[in-house]
């Protein structure tokens, strides 16, 4: 019975696609115009390739539930960076869950033709959050079918957008200026602030490493899945990016519902069977995103709590199956509070972009959690050279430093341009300040909780 629930290689590859490929992040990137193609290719080479190799080495050398927390903690055991990374990694999840919950009422409006009031919106958002939370109470191997279906749907949606873009161009031509200069990298604040979304679109390989106990042969399956899944993901991103960029005027792309807008503009319909089917499939992928990430995030938080680096509630496990329900419940509560605040903000300021505000805040916190992984990789090579490494990043010391520090620098730069307002005009401040203030509050709360937990753990 247990053997039947083990992941096959195909399951692991589809899990990589389900975790890493994020359909809802395509629209913000497409909004920067044709320069997105330069950034996609550049980030594939400068970030995806080294990050994928480093994750493969660390994930196959140090298997277990701890994920990136375990790697950082092993590399720097006397510092708080493991605890900080686990906090940043965890807090990103309820923020992300809230940002996706905000999209659900709009998708249901497309499906049903109904317009929801604020109370109905809140109920829909809470239903999404607590459905995901309930599913997180069970092992990820019990959700193989959901993950596989979600991965398949994501690929279908991306290919559909790409094909529709080609059809639109054949019939009507390109809607955006396709001059060579438009493909050069944009260095304006608008473009640079979305680079973090491209990096986010490549994150998540370490989540699959926390599935090791559910795999038949993790030391072989993890690197195989990361390589094959990474190639598929890169190709799908480029194809779907072309579809959106070719058929939709850049200024008309919505950050909140870009995929649905893309299909509507390409087909010339805002409703109907086809658009409704796309909305339904997109909704299913949102559940797939949350379910696939919940295992990695909750396991990492529980592992850190058991080591005394996170609040004790995160260490609570369900006696029935040993799942980290404390972390899952806390995520559900925090996401619910964020959605309630979002409803209040929407009532006070109807034009606010809640999805992007919540999504950008989660981006900052998630990227912060990854920054220490790269120096941890170098440190573990130095202090633990004798551990068996089923997959080993090729190259000498100099090359390894380049492979580690370039993606780390890209992460830090993208955090800066996402969270720090570089202009004091009212429009810039209204867009950036919620992200800046939210990031500072999240960091400060984390420091307080980590310090309090450390005192209790050592007393």
Go through each PLM region and give its residues.
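Membrane-interface "cap" regions at the ends of multi-pass membrane proteins
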Residues: 1-42, 48-53, 64, 74, ...
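C-terminal membrane-solvent junction of multi-pass transporters and transport-like membrane proteins
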Residues: 3, 313-322, 367-420
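Helix-loop-helix junctions that connect adjacent transmembrane segments
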Residues: 3, 35-38, 115, 120, ...
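Select transmembrane alpha-helical segments in multipass membrane proteins
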Residues: 5-16, 38, 78-92, 124-128, ...
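Hydrophobic transmembrane alpha-helices that form the core helical bundles
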Residues: 30-31, 50-129, 134-137, 283-300, ...
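A generic transmembrane alpha-helix motif of multi-pass inner-membrane proteins
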Residues: 40, 168-169, 357, 361-369, ...
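TM-loop-TM module centered on a large, flexible mid-protein loop between adjacent transmembrane helices
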Residues: 70-78, 110-114, 225-291, 310-362
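Membrane-interface loop-to-helix entry segments
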Residues: 119-172, 203, 226-230, 363-372, ...
